[in-house]
Amino acid sequence: MEADITSQAVGLASNTDFSLWSLFIRADFIVKSVILMLIGCSIYSWAIIIEKFRSFKKINLETEEFEEKFWKSKSAETFYNSLPVNLENPMALLFKDSMQTLLKAKNKSNLNERMSNMLEVNIEKQMVTLEKGFTFLATVGSTAPFIGLFGTVWGIMNSFQSIAISRNTSLAIVAPGIAEALFATALGLLAAIPAVVAYNKFNNDSKKYLQKLENFSKRFLSII
């Protein structure tokens, strides 16, 4: 490792290119691994963010349409029979599963209580599907800055070792190593900030949709 640091220190004085690519190329294996990990986390986070944004928009529009048609229908059974086979909307799936249970129920005693319990289970199942990916966003938001900080600390340690080996404290020796180290911190923040903002937004959207499902369940129970 000392040999690598020595050769790095020798070349730093003549290499003052601070482009992002140059910072990555000059970094050692550990810092490169941190950078690649953070870039990967950021890309996957953005994939989740885009998918969830589209998903919530679609779900909310379909839910409004579903509720409007449902409450205008003659009866729950008539509306159930008119539903398409392939459903994706959580509220539509909740209603479909509930109606299947209701129509198959032979014993009508305590039906409301049993339906209420089943609706709670189905709501939980739909919310688990809806909140898929939330954990990753929360994890990236909370850990990415610390991963970036680790890369920064490691890079600064390498810079100090370069100074000790070269016995040169000039800015040309110190600056490139510090820049590489701070690059990792910047990437950590770049990955974490969108993930935290998106997680908070989607978590709030999820709570609002949960309230919609619970309200629908209560109204549905009142008419069966």
Region spans (language model):
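Hydrophobic alpha-helical transmembrane segments
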Residues: 20-52
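Predominantly long cytosolic amphipathic alpha-helical stalk/bundle segments
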Residues: 57-170, 197-224
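Hydrophobic alpha-helical transmembrane segments and adjacent short intramembrane/lumenal linkers
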Residues: 167-181
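N-terminal membrane-entry
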Residues: 31-35, 131-141, 180-184
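Residue-level signal for the membrane-embedded core of alpha-helical transmembrane segments
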Residues: 34-37, 41-44, 144-147, 151-154, ...
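Short, strongly hydrophobic alpha-helical membrane anchors
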Residues: 1-26
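Hydrophobic alpha-helical transmembrane segments of polytopic membrane proteins
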Residues: 181-195
